[in-house]
């Protein structure tokens, strides 16, 4: 078992979102290590202003060359893009490091046409901004049938949960990338791995979303 599977304690972003979830729900947060992240109602309410109409098939928004570990974990992304992305797809690399080396791949590549600053800076100085809701980022996922969810600086993907709450189907390199501990990995979400046949399943989307609301929110436990 890799070291990340014993890393039960939540990182900064998940910790802050979980604290907000308990506070907004008026529920006392349990004492001790929390290993399943929660999203607060105020965060989930942002989706009310976003369309879930599927205008894209595949999408990926993020960084690749920002850090050696991330570059290694995401080395499969560009080959996948070149093989599977279509005129309906959406790609955007959003770090200065990517802009320096990337060459536009196709009409679906919006890397050089989008000027907004990337979500995470080179030195991972996250701060509270990392807990903010990026409407453009989530909007693309909400309008996509599938979202690429590569590992980041650790062998798991926060994007996996973001994809599910956006009602898109995750595509992972490996099974264990769906969570940084066994409890998360065994929740039971449905997703595709590299090499699968990527068939859009509305029943998967509905199942995953309902499971997410039950497992990762306190929307049904408010005072």
Regions found by a protein language model. Name each.
Residues 1-161, 165-189, 211-222:
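Nucleotide-sugar donor-binding catalytic core of glycosyltransferases
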Residues 187-212:
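C-terminal "capping" alpha-helix adjacent to the active site of nucleotide-linked donor transferases
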């Amino acid at each position: 078992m890799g070291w990340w599977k014993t890393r039960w304690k939540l990182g900064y972003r998940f910790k802050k979102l979980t604290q907000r979830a308990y506070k907004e729900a008026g529920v006392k947060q349990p004492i001790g290590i929390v290993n399943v992240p929660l999203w607060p109602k105020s965060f989930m309410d942002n989706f009310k202003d976003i369309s879930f109409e599927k205008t894209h098939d595949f999408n990926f928004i993020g960084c690749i060359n920002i850090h050696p570990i991330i570059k290694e974990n995401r080395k499969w992304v560009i080959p996948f893009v070149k093989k599977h992305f279509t005129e309906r797809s959406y790609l955007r690399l959003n770090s200065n490091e990517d802009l320096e080396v990337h060459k536009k791949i196709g009409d679906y590549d919006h890397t050089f046409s989008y000027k907004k600053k990337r979500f995470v800076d080179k030195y991972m100085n996250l701060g509270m901004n990392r807990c903010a809701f990026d409407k453009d980022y989530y909007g693309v996922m909400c309008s996509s049938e599938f979202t690429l969810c590569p590992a980041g600086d650790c062998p798991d993907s926060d994007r996996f949960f973001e994809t599910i709450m956006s009602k898109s189907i995750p595509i992972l390199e490996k099974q264990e990338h769906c969570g940084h501990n066994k409890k998360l990995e065994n929740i039971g979400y449905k997703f595709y791995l590299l090499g699968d046949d990527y068939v859009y399943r509305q029943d998967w989307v509905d199942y995953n979303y309902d499971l997410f609301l039950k497992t990762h929110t306190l929307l049904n436990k408010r005072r």
